[in-house]
């Protein structure tokens, strides 16, 4: 399997305004856009190529709408996902409760999907610790219970963003190394949505 290309479908889930799009912008474009984002309708797609060992990994990232009215549509996008980054706002306790909803959805519909819990806007806590509304230890206990990994991130400063996506890729490659793969089972990069590709592999 040396030098094999690996495609991984990754879905971003979470309540609206938790910062899913900002997270993707920071990872793919290494930028933080100031000002209000236009709400995602349905889902936005972007792909980024990276290297894990001697493998070329393409993360196909689906940034789904957080509004409850798009719930049914979101299910279309996370079908077949190998990894899900479930986001919540560290300053909004209701967003963590909403994250639990998405975890239940994934567990019932995509049992093989690896879940990563992602607390966002950690920079706001650096400014004022009293703004925290989601206790780290409570989330860690929950993550342990559902066998998920936990990251607290800031799209503004870039804290732990690259580490999160790197871990997603490394975990999938590790799992793939123990499986007999006769064909690509990752994201179909020909799907509609005007895919854009960004590479961080350098030869």
Curated annotation (Swiss-Prot):
Q: Which UniProt keywords apply?
A: Autophagy, Cytoplasm, Cytoplasmic vesicle, Cytoskeleton, GTP-binding, Hydrolase, Lipoprotein, Magnesium, Membrane, Metal-binding, Nucleotide-binding, Phosphoprotein, Prenylation, Protein transport, Transport
- Activation and inhibition: Regulated by guanine nucleotide exchange factors (GEFs) which promote the exchange of bound GDP for free GTP. Regulated by GTPase activating proteins (GAPs) which increase the GTP hydrolysis activity. Inhibited by GDP dissociation inhibitors (GDIs).
Under which main EC class is this enzyme filed?
A: hydrolase
Q: Where is the lipid attached (S-geranylgeranyl cysteine)?
A: 200-201
Q: What SUPFAM superfamilies does the record point to?
A: P-loop containing nucleoside triphosphate hydrolases
Q: What is the effect of changing residue 22 to N?
A: Predominantly in the GTP-bound state. No effect on subcellular location
Task: Please list the residues that carry the modification Phosphotyrosine.
Answer: 17, 172
Q: What is its EC number?
A: 3.6.5.2
> Which residues does the record give as Mg(2+) binding sites?
21, 40, 63
Q: How does the record classify its membrane topology?
A: Lipid-anchor
Query: Does the record carry Metal-binding as a key word?
Result: yes
Describe PTMs of this protein: Prenylated; prenylation is required for RAB24 localization to autophagosomes. Isoprenylation is inefficient compared to other Rab family members. Phosphorylated at Tyr-17 and Tyr-172. Cytosolic pool of RAB24 is more phosphorylated than the membrane-associated pool.
User: Effect of altering residue 123 to I?
Assistant: Accumulates in punctate structures in both cytoplasmic and nuclear compartments. Disrupts the integrity of the nuclear envelope
Tissue specificity statement from the Swiss-Prot or TrEMBL entry: Widely expressed, with highest expression in brain.
Q: Binding of GTP: at which residues?
A: 19-21, 40, 66, 121, 123, 156
Q: One MF term in GO for this entry?
A: G protein activity
Q: Which GO terms describe its biological process?
A: attachment of spindle microtubules to kinetochore; autophagy; meiotic nuclear division; oocyte maturation; protein transport
One further remark on this entry is: The unusual Ser-67, instead of a conserved Gln in other family members, is the cause of low GTPase activity. As a result, the predominant nucleotide associated with the protein is GTP.
The UniProt subunit note reads as follows: Interacts with ZFYVE20. Does not interact with the GDP dissociation inhibitors ARHGDIA and ARHGDIB.
Give the UniProt family note.
Belongs to the small GTPase superfamily. Rab family.
Q: What does this protein do?
A: The small GTPases Rab are key regulators of intracellular membrane trafficking, from the formation of transport vesicles to their fusion with membranes. Rabs cycle between an inactive GDP-bound form and an active GTP-bound form that is able to recruit to membranes different sets of downstream effectors directly responsible for vesicle formation, movement, tethering and fusion. RAB24 is an atypical RAB protein that presents low GTPase activity and thereby exists predominantly in the GTP-bound active state. RAB24 is required for the clearance of late autophagic vacuoles under basal conditions.
Q: What is this protein called?
A: Ras-related protein Rab-24
**Organism, scientific name:** Mus musculus (Mouse)
